[in-house]
């Protein structure tokens, strides 16, 4: 029997496993991406930590190297080298050179001075290069009366810092000048002041400005000339040293002041009046060694002993 029409039967097959497979693939893809994301982040963090650690290590090494270099820079000269320098300097044929004992007194103070040590020297002498060498870790400045010699010396020794100054005094006028300064001790010649603006007859006010700003640890007075009545004498250099020492604003409150040729009348007179006997700690051959402390800005007396004497004698007057 034949059927009367075409009947097409269509079958729709549903494969549920395909949908499940797609979901599973997405999960695997998500897991894969997440894994690599976490791995990337961990790698980035590790790299950053490594860079920071490397920088810190480099900084530590650099700091250690700098510290070692600094320590080496401020190291002192060997004792044997210093003794050799003093020995040969004292053996000079120059009749105006210092003795071994005098140079050693100054050398010992420079060795104990904490670097950087500030050394001020009045006068270019036979020992100039010695002082510069002994204070190789600090600053050394020289003050010279002869401008031509100062320029010549600086030309052949460019490492030397020297300034010329014009002295207006005469050694034969020492007592009159000292008396005038004592009378003006409460005004223009007071012991604590900025000499750059001073009108005191014995104050040096024409040095470079920065010289007055330095806190000098050691001052050596070995100039200007003082071996005659018409030479400048050392009244101004001793007075200036006394004021600089007492007017310090920082650093070590004590200043070592050395005066050479202390046997002469002018050096002894000015030493007693401005540096004071109570501050004299040593006298070696022709060299006097004082230790001065900075004073209050309102001070009007260079020496404490004189103030006491006046207070004792006033009741009996």
Swiss-Prot record:
Transmembrane segments: 27-47
Identification of the protein by name: Protein IRX15-LIKE
Main location: Golgi
Family annotation (PANTHER family): OS11G0490100 PROTEIN
Subcellular location: Golgi apparatus membrane
Gene Ontology CC terms: Golgi apparatus; Golgi membrane
Superkingdom, natural source: Eukaryota
UniProt keyword annotation of Nucleotide-binding present: no
């Amino acid at each position: 029997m034949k059927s009367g029409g075409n009947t097409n039967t269509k079958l729709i097959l549903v494969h549920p496993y395909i949908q499940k497979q797609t979901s599973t693939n997405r999960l695997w893809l998500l897991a894969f991406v997440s894994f690599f994301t976490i791995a990337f982040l961990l790698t980035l963090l590790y790299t950053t930590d490594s860079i920071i650690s490397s920088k810190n290590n480099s900084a530590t090494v650099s700091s250690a190297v700098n510290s070692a270099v600094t320590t080496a820079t401020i190291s002192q000269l060997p004792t044997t080298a210093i003794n050799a320098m003093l020995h040969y300097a004292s053996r000079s044929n120059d009749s105006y050179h210092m003795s071994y004992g005098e140079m050693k007194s100054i050398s010992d103070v420079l060795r104990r001075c904490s670097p950087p040590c500030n050394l001020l020297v009045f006068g270019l002498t036979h020992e100039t290069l010695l002082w510069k060498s002994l204070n190789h870790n600090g600053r050394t400045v020289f003050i010279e009366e002869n401008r031509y010699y100062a320029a010549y010396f600086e030309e052949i020794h460019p490492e030397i810092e020297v300034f010329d100054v014009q002295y207006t005094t005469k050694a034969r006028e020492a007592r009159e000048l000292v008396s005038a300064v004592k009378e003006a001790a409460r005004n223009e010649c007071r012991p604590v002041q900025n000499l750059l603006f001073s009108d005191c007859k014995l104050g040096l006010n024409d040095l470079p400005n920065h010289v007055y700003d330095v806190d000098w640890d050691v001052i050596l007075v070995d100039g200007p000339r003082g071996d005659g009545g018409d030479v400048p004498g050392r009244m101004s250099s001793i007075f200036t040293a006394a004021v600089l020492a007492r007017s310090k604003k920082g650093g070590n409150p004590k200043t070592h002041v050395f005066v050479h040729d202390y046997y002469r009348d002018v050096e002894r007179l000015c030493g007693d009046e401005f540096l004071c006997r109570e501050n004299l700690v040593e006298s070696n051959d022709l060299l006097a060694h004082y230790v001065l402390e900075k004073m209050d800005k309102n001070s009007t007396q260079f020496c404490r002993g004189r103030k006491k004497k006046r207070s004792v004698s006033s009741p009996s007057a």
